[in-house]
Amino acid sequence: MKPKLVFLPFLIFITVFIEESEAVHPVVLETKLGDIRGNEFFFLSKKIRTFFGVPFAEPPVEEFRFRKPREKKQWKKLFDATKPANACFQTRDNYNTSFWGSEMWNANTQISEDCLYLNIWAPADAYNLTVMVWFFGGGFYSGSPSLSIYDGRALAATQHVIVVNINYRLGPFGFLYLDHPDAPGNMGLLDQQLALHWIRQNIVSFGGNPDKVSVFGQSAGAASIVAHLIAPGSRGLFKNAILQSGSLENTWAINSPFRAKQKSEKLLELVGCNKTTVENSMSCLRLVSPEQLSLSTWNISLTYLEFPFVIVSRDKHFFGHLDARAALREGDFNRDVNLMIGMNKDEGNYWNIYQLPQFFDKAEPPELTRHQFDNLIDSTFSIQPDIIRSAAKYIYSDPNCTDHGRKTRFYAGQMNQIVGDYFFSCDSLWLADQFFLFLQICSTPNGSLKNPPKVFVYYFTQSSSANPWPKWTGAMHGYEIEYVFGVPLSYSKIYKRREQIFSRKIMQFWASFAKNGTPRLRVLKNSEHWPEFNEHNNYRWMQLRSGSNIRPIKRRKETECQFWRRVKDTEYTAYLTQEYSSSCHINSYRILLFIPFFFIFSAF
């Protein structure tokens, strides 16, 4: 990114943080595991307590690297919980080290394999409060519960809830898979699950009600929450779930056992640990430095928006007897949870800047010709057969544009939409439909649910005046988070008044949903009534935008998402073939995709 884009430097955030901070006093709590010391201070005229770096598991180091997490043992001495949790081992985004737009997502605390800790914010008078548990995103290769954008003090102070940010292992440390006890896969999900169990057992000491736990997460965090809806061991650990721009069905979020093992074996080869037995290979791998392991993961061959180590769809410990992808289609998931599912208007722009910098890494709004647009679809979706790419070009093109050599903003905008739709939004909408479908089945006279949970859908279109990226990027992937955590209130000097008001409303929606399973404002205008996602309400969404633009809207993206759903259904058929046939090859995938797409293309 060019230096002229760096108009929101890190120093601004540091300065404002110091100005907003009040006098801090120590506070000590008794817990089942031992005494713990945190801090107490006033924020927005409310007394808040923080307990940072609280351990929920034993360190997963040395012989326990790559293995399931172990419960934290009791401690005898006073535990100091005044420093934010370590980040789990990861590489840094070196896109531009002087640009806050990328640096804000890099770990801001020590990076370590010893990282299974929580950060907790609670009102000083907390008693029997709702608990909101945050799952951070980052593609399962980066992220931290301690990023400044995830500071829970504003949410705790204004909504009178307890906020808990959990941590989990990333990359090969959390998702290496060899179908073996030494590398069982989904260790990061097991970390999350253990954190939820810890919260259920210990949050009462902090003033929380273990029966009033809700989870919310973004991107990989949202995909993780969907995994917990499926996992037998996560049942009963939370009542409500908010999924921000992510679902387990997202292509980047989940691998088949075949693909997960393929990547893991490649990593063994890259670091010289491909021994004759898994036991010997893992003994070797546990001796490799974490730095070398993290860097080597990026030498694995990946497609567009494919991440190195992610959730594996079948394993013995987290999903148990279930295949996660099949479970979503067959309704084999927890239906006793209210869901809020949403997407941002400009999900794709963030990824296009990184993946297609020659076209999108610009200060001014990018423009593309129709020829360039077609070529970018071919490269972005190169693993898809020609007929799918042709159908995508047809659906996302402008039939009135006959000059294919003229550059326009329209086609740059369509690249934003096509990447956002395929990799994020359409899977979220499918999950909303799927969840509602099975709720309807279960709430029939012969069904099992007397009071079925509710589903709500949002469409976030608000950009930020403090966003360091150019204005044309809009409401990108991840840029609703600052409003959810009340960043405009914490850093009021760099946000407009209307953005602060909007952030308060977003926090109210989120906290109301966490408390009651329904997103509501305390002072409600008629237009701000959030309709439930159902047939009676014509499956309407809630548009989230400042001013008078918080209002229900008609469902969008129907044609686009119907198309991508047919693609995903055919990919699922290929997945089944790959997993259950001993003679599968990539060519069978392409053949399976091609056969039905004559009919899919003709439908448009």
UniProtKB/Swiss-Prot annotation:
Belongs to the type-B carboxylesterase/lipase family. It is a peripheral membrane protein. The keyword Ribonucleoprotein does not apply. InterPro entries: AB_hydrolase_fold, AChE-related_enzymes, CarbesteraseB, Carboxylesterase_B_AS, Carboxylesterase_B_CS, Cholinesterase. It is found in: Synapse; Secreted; Cell membrane. This is Acetylcholinesterase 4. Disulfide bonds join C88-C115, C273-C284, C426-C561. Its main location: other. GO terms for molecular function: acetylcholinesterase activity. Residues 1-23 form the signal peptide. The active site is at S219, E347, H477. Its EC number is 3.1.1.7. PROSITE patterns: CARBOXYLESTERASE_B_1 (PS00122), CARBOXYLESTERASE_B_2 (PS00941). It comes from Caenorhabditis briggsae. It comes from the Eukaryota. Glycans are attached at N96, N128, N274, N299, N400, N446. Rapidly hydrolyzes choline released into the synapse. It catalyses: acetylcholine + H2O = choline + acetate + H(+). One of its GO terms (cellular component) is extracellular space. Keywords: Cell membrane, Disulfide bond, Glycoprotein, Hydrolase, Membrane, Neurotransmitter degradation, Secreted, Serine esterase, Signal, Synapse.
